[in-house]
């Protein structure tokens, strides 16, 4: 028997729920998309008052299962039970009405609306005349935020908030539905260390209130810090569930990838050549000031700094996204004027942006179209026409080399996992055969197996003589991959560290000056 969402909601409201060991359970779940079995007979069991992490490589099926539990997708087979009662979730609204809320990696809030309006959208309190009672709405919001320990003004427009604060609004909105289950997809991907600590305090408080939290993450340290137990998926199959205290980091990696990852940072000593890119006294009014650095052939220059230090802004200016106010950019010792990305590409420069959804992928296009848009090389153009067969073969070979998981090149890129999207974007730039490669957060939101593969690719390009600039918020990545580290703070370069002398303490000291 399948209980309708409305019936289950009534059962929840009455408190007369069936006795059950698990708050939420899914068994025998199968989901197919054209050419792909995303989930194959998987299971997932969530206990009340626990944080249950979901681990796996990109494309393992984690997000697909969570979207099924949140009512976004419907399974082809299997059963979902809430507090022991079978339930069918035909839409996200069904899930919300039954106490299951999902906070997506790309936050779904209205920037032009206030905090309170976002939280109570379509559920606003009304006065006797049937109009929205704004006073009551703001009072309810204040009470809710205070209960959660969130310090926000209910009347502030969401567009004025930081990513971390917007996330707090999403959590408050989920709790306002009296949710029993809260699904969080990569919640710390864009947060500072201090913001992560605040988020974890709120998660622990929610756990104490008996809420079951599903926590999707690629960050191993978070699993051990916040999760009570975890489940691993691989290639659409359920691998196992364990208490986080019973396993080591290496155990989890083996479960995730089905193989040993012998070296996360395969950095090799390669000959460092002449200066390829030289930046002198670069300024962007109100953003960064007097930035100077050189990058040599075969060198990986790591760029570290706290959020807001200006790292990404410098990269965008060097690539011509935002032209500089003053300063000089030289390639092979000759000053160049880079006033657009097209000009940068013509100088064999490549730029992998930090936000693959907004500024990297063209989500409505397929893999082939996304990979080929940056290719301006003569070998793919003859008499003004693109040689489509040669270009398609090159893209297909690149996908094989990067191990992109897809049934074919005509799959829309929005249907790929985050890690596979990132591989496609890297492939886009590898096809241009760049001499200068700028990577901004190249492994953000990527699983441990894909990270190792991307690190290997970066080292391979350095070995081929490419000058690499790698911006990263992950300290082990900066220290493990860089020949030198440039550190920024509040729009200024505060120092350089050679690989042999770079430590986390020294980098953080320079990043906070």
From Swiss-Prot:
ATP binds at residues 56-63. It is an enzyme of class 7 (translocase). The keyword Cell division does not apply. GO terms for cellular component: plasma membrane. Its main location: membrane. One of its GO terms (molecular function) is ATP hydrolysis activity. Its EC number is 7.5.2.11, 7.5.2.7. Residues 24-260, 270-510 form the ABC transporter domain. It is found in: Cell inner membrane. It comes from the Bacteria. It catalyses: D-ribose(out) + ATP + H2O = D-ribose(in) + ADP + phosphate + H(+); D-galactose(out) + ATP + H2O = D-galactose(in) + ADP + phosphate + H(+). It is a peripheral membrane protein. Keywords: ATP-binding, Cell inner membrane, Cell membrane, Membrane, Nucleotide-binding, Repeat, Sugar transport, Translocase, Transport. Part of an ABC transporter complex involved in carbohydrate import. Could be involved in ribose, galactose and/or methyl galactoside import. Responsible for energy coupling to the transport system. Belongs to the ABC transporter superfamily. Carbohydrate importer 2 (CUT2) (TC 3.A.1.2) family. This is Putative ribose/galactose/methyl galactoside import ATP-binding protein 2. It comes from Agrobacterium fabrum (strain C58 / ATCC 33970) (Agrobacterium tumefaciens (strain C58)).
């Amino acid at each position: 028997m399948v209980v309708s969402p409305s019936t289950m909601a009534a059962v929840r409201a009455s408190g007369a729920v069936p006795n059950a060991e698990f708050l939420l359970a899914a068994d025998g779940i199968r989901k197919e998309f054209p050419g792909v079995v995303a989930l194959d007979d998987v299971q997932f069991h969530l206990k009340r008052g626990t944080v249950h992490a979901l681990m796996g490589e990109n494309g393992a099926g984690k997000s697909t299962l969570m979207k099924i539990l949140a009512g976004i997708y419907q399974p082809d087979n299997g059963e979902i039970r809430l507090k022991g009662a079978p339930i069918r979730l035909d839409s996200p609204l069904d899930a919300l009405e039954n106490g299951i809320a999902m906070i997506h990696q790309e936050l779904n809030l209205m920037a032009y609306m206030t905090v309170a309006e976002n939280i109570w959208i379509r559920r606003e309190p009304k006065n006797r005349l049937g109009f929205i009672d704004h006073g009551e709405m703001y009072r309810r919001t204040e009470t809710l935020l205070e209960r959660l320990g969130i310090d926000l003004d209910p009347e502030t427009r969401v567009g004025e908030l930081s990513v971390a604060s917007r996330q707090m609004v999403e959590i408050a909105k989920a709790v306002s539905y009296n949710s029993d289950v809260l699904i969080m997809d990569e919640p710390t991907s864009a947060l500072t260390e201090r913001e992560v600590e605040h988020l974890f305090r709120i998660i622990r408080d929610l756990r104490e209130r008996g809420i079951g939290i599903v926590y999707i993450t690629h960050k191993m340290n978070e699993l051990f810090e916040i999760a009570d137990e975890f489940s691993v998926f691989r290639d659409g199959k359920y691998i196992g569930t364990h208490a986080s205290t019973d396993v080591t980091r290496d155990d989890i990696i083996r479960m995730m990838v089905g193989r040993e990852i012998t070296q996360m940072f395969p950095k090799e000593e390669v000959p460092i050549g002449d200066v390829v890119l030289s930046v002198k006294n670069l300024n962007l009014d109100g953003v960064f000031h007097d930035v100077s650095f050189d990058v040599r052939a075969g060198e990986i220059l790591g760029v570290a700094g706290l959020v807001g230090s200006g790292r990404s802004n410098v990269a965008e200016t060097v690539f011509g996204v935002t032209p500089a106010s003053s300063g000089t950019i030289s390639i092979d010792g000759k000053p160049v004027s880079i006033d657009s990305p097209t000009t940068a590409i013509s100088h064999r420069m490549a730029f992998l942006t930090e936000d693959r959804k907004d500024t990297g992928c063209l989500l409505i296009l397929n893999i082939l179209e996304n990979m080929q848009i940056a290719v301006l090389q003569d070998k793919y153009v003859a008499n003004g026409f693109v040689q489509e067969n040669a270009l398609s073969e090159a893209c297909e070979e690149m996908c094989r080399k990067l191990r992109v998981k897809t049934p074919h090149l005509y799959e829309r890129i929005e249907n790929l996992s985050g890690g596979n999207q990132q591989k496609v974007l890297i492939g886009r730039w590898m096809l241009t055969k760049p001499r200068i490669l700028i990577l901004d957060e190249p492994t953000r939101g990527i699983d441990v197996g894909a990270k190792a593969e991307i690190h290997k690719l970066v080292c391979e390009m350095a070995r081929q003589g490419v000058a690499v600039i790698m911006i990263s918020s992950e300290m082990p990545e900066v220290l493990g991959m860089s020949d030198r580290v440039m550190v920024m703070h509040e729009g200024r370069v505060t120092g350089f560290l050679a690989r042999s002398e770079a430590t986390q303490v020294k980098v953080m000291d320079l990043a906070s000056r």
